[in-house]
Amino acid sequence: LTMDTNMAGIAFPQNYPRHFRRAVLNSSLEFAQTLLQFTRLTWLHEGAGKTHLVIKNSAHTARVALLLRLFPRARFVYLHRRPIDSIRSLVQVKQRLAQLVGLQEPPSSLRQVEETVAAHDQLQEAFARSRHLIPKGQLVEIAYDDLVQSPLNTLQRIYCALEIGGWDSARDAIAARIARGRAYQAEPVVLEPEAEQRLQALLS
C-alpha cells in the first residue's frame, strides 16, 4: 500500500483521477519492483506446499504487459460484470474507504460517479489493447453471474481452461467453502438519487 498503487487515490480522493492515471495506467519501475517483492514475500508466507498464488486486483486489468514481464507464465481470469453494477459498487467502496483511510474530504457521490465511470472505461480500454499479449491458454473469461449462481461449476471451468491440475483433490474443499458462504447476503448498493441518475445517464 504505497503511493505507487491505486490506494493513493483512496488516500487522496480529491485527486483520484491523477493518481489513477499515474499509478494504474502508467505503473512505475518502483511499483514493478515492489510488486515483485510483495509477491515473493506473500509466497514465502502463504505458499508452502501450494503450487499457485492467486491475486485478485482489478487494477491489474491495466497491467497485463507488466505482469507478463514479471511472471511470463501468469494466468488470467477476466470477470465480466455489468458495468453499472461494477461502477456502483466501486463508488460505494471508495466512499467507505475514504472515511476509513482518506487524508482528504471525499468528493461528492456525483463527482465520484463521473470519475469512476471514466476510470472504468480507461481500464477496459487498457485491457483491450494488451489482451493480445496473453499467450494462448493463459486467459479465461467468465461471467460474474455464473460465478455467483454456479460457483463450483464455474471454478471447474477455470481449472480446465487454464489447465490447472488438482481439481479432483481440491473439489471437496472448494464445495465446503461455498456451502459455508451460502447464508451470506450481499448488502444492496444504493447511491444518492442524483448520483444514481447520473450513473444511468452516463451508461445509457
Describe the residue ranges of each PLM region.
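PAPS-dependent sulfation machinery
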Residues: 1-53
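Short, solvent-exposed loop/turn segments at secondary-structure junctions
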Residues: 6, 59-62, 82-86, 92-93, ...
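PAPS-dependent sulfotransferases, especially Golgi type II membrane carbohydrate sulfotransferases
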Residues: 26-29, 43, 91-204
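Active-site-proximal structural scaffolding
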Residues: 28, 60, 69-72, 79, ...
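Short, hydrophobic/aromatic alpha-helical segments in well-folded domains
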Residues: 38, 63-66
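Short, well-ordered loop/turn elements at secondary-structure boundaries
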Residues: 46-50, 70-74, 136
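Short catalytic-loop micro-motif centered on adjacent basic/acidic residues
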Residues: 52-55, 141-143
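Conserved phosphate-donor/acceptor-positioning beta-strand/loop module used by diverse small-molecule
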Residues: 57, 67-92, 158
